[in-house]
Curated annotation (Swiss-Prot):
Protein name: Threonylcarbamoyl-AMP synthase
Organism: Dichelobacter nodosus (strain VCS1703A)
Pfam family name, one: Sua5_yciO_yrdC
EC number: 2.7.7.87
UniProt cross-references to PANTHER family, sorted A to Z: SUA5, THREONYLCARBAMOYL-AMP SYNTHASE
GO molecular function, one term: ATP binding
Gene3D superfamilies, sorted: DHBP synthase
Family designation: Belongs to the SUA5 family. TsaC subfamily.
Domain (YrdC-like): residue spans on this chain: 10-190
GO cellular component, one term: cytoplasm
One Gene Ontology term from the biological process aspect of the record: tRNA threonylcarbamoyladenosine modification
Amino acid sequence: MNEKACWQLPQDKESVYRHIFAGGVFAYPTEAVYGLGGNPADERAVCEILRLKGRTAAKGLIMVAGNWAQCCGWVSGVSKRDQAEMMDWAGDYPTTFIVYAGEKLCAHVATADGKTAIRISQHPLIQELCALIGQPLLSTSANLSGQEPARSVAAVRQYFPDLPMVLGALGAAERPSRIIDWHSRQVIRA
């Protein structure tokens, strides 16, 4: 791992790209809190995120993408109509949707019932990261399981002192994304 690396886009895009596709994990700002990211197709990244957080795989993990085109093969059963409706439901607030998992995901990203979670993010840095790698990115809050999510670089460093980071500004959301099961329309987190 590149100890305590602090990257900025676009100037460090090659280092970030190599890190992601080498199975690396890193912290980065999201719409409301700092997240832990990695490649959802790489079991090393998934297992490292679970280890860092002290969390089991039972809950699955969230992915973020910059647009629906990046989700092809990562989610399934989401029609163009569903995509448009999800964007309408989300409005301006970050909203994560639970949908059926696609074939590209590695173990532990999907739940036992074959579902996964995806958020199409309007955050400029997330859009830039996903455009760089051409696919979704794992995204879970940068904290130990059960603890408060990190809202500053200092808080990320307190939880994960040696974790590489992509620097940037947090979005304007005051709390983590709401989560909705798209098929049942059940609100999991408001």
